[in-house]
A protein has these predicted regions:
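Cyclophilin-like peptidyl-prolyl cis-trans isomerases
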Residues: 1-243
Length: 243
């Protein structure tokens, strides 16, 4: 599956970004599986039994649910009220929430968010990851989001689902979706790399696109609510020729 999908990491939650890079480079995820997949919720992967040895990465992570707003942060506001944050918008292609009252910022659980799972303890994340199949905004600031799927999300959506009565865990191991290869894109041989362009969310053109989605100009629409939900804003990505 990893050969078909590509995720992008953002330098918020930088410790988690470095953690998953270390795990990828030591081959931790190779041969593991997506074993818990809940329809309309998440696809979770990793070592379901917790038996695999971590060689170079940290055994546990300090939570980075949110962080202090960095100086000079480029934040493009969506421009509508939000039920989960004082303000929402985009940071370098990532949907994000912000509280200027608290001086905090975080990435949000829109579709395709890449995050680490954890137990009840705040700092119990280590290796288990999940990808959201639909928006799950109520999880914002409760788990650490540090990336998003930017290519191949259709393959994530096609992963075998588990039974709702078993918390989404797939009992039949033969139906698990294997992780054959999990790599940092920069480490992939040049001839095998994908070259993708993401829409510049700091641009005037993107602000115009936001407005066009907030009040759709097509003749089909008779009611225009002057509202846009954060997770309904498309973030265009396109494949470009190899350079």
């Amino acid at each position: 599956l990893a050969a078909r999908g590509l995720g992008r990491l953002k330098p918020l939650a930088q410790a988690h970004v470095e953690q998953v890079k270390l795990l990828a480079r030591e081959g931790y995820y190779d041969g593991l599986n997506f074993y818990r997949v809940v329809q309309g919720f998440v696809a979770q992967g990793g070592d379901e039994r917790g038996n695999k040895t971590i060689r170079t990465a940290a055994p546990f992570m300090q939570a980075e649910f949110d962080e202090r707003i960095p100086r000079g942060l480029d934040f493009t506001p969506l421009g509508n009220p939000d039920g989960y944050a004082d303000q929402v918008g985009f940071i370098n292609g990532f949907p994000a929430g912000m509280s200027r009252r608290e001086n905090r910022v975080w990435l949000t659980h829109c579709t395709g968010a890449f995050a680490f799972g954890r137990g009840n303890e705040r700092d119990s994340a280590a290796t288990e990851f999940y990808i959201t199949l639909q928006p799950q905004r109520y999880l914002d600031r409760n788990l650490t989001v540090f990336g998003r799927v930017i290519w191949g999300m259709e393959h994530v959506q096609a992963i075998m689902r588990g039974e709702p009565g078993n918390g989404g865990v797939i009992v039949d191991r033969s139906k698990w979706t294997p992780i054959r290869s999990f790599r940092v894109a920069a480490d992939v041989p040049v001839q095998d790399q994908l070259y993708l362009e993401t829409f510049n969310t700091n641009s005037e053109l993107f602000s115009e696109l936001i407005e066009a989605r907030r009040n759709r100009p097509e003749d089909f629409f008779y009611y225009r609510p002057d509202y846009l939900d954060l997770c309904q804003m498309p973030l265009p990505v396109r494949l470009t020729p190899n350079r």
